[in-house]
């Protein structure tokens, strides 16, 4: 089942940052987003981790950056894609 993906305003700003600063990281984020859309919130690459305080999940982009998201109905809402999560 394909899930729709939306970005919070902060997450969109993060995404635009990667577009201009680091194409390798952007490519990794795009791969994570494609897998989230195709396979859902838990499966795929990036080591999904349940976050307690924000009732969301994160996947590892690289050693310091995380893709943080929540699932609402059939939609995945990206909360951030730059920096560590704040759990």
Q: Where are the regions a protein language model picked out?
A:
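Enriched for short, Lys/Arg-rich terminal
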Residues: 2-5, 9-31, 45, 58-66, ...
């Amino acid at each position: 089942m394909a899930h729709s993906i939306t970005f919070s305003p902060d997450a969109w700003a993060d995404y635009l940052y990667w577009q201009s600063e680091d194409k390798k990281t952007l490519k990794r984020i795009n791969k994570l987003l494609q897998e989230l859309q195709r396979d859902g919130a838990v499966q795929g690459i990036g080591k999904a981790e349940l976050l307690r305080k924000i009732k969301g999940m994160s996947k590892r982009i690289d050693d310091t950056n995380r893709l943080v998201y929540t699932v609402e109905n059939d939609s995945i809402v990206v909360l951030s894609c730059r920096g560590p999560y704040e759990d």
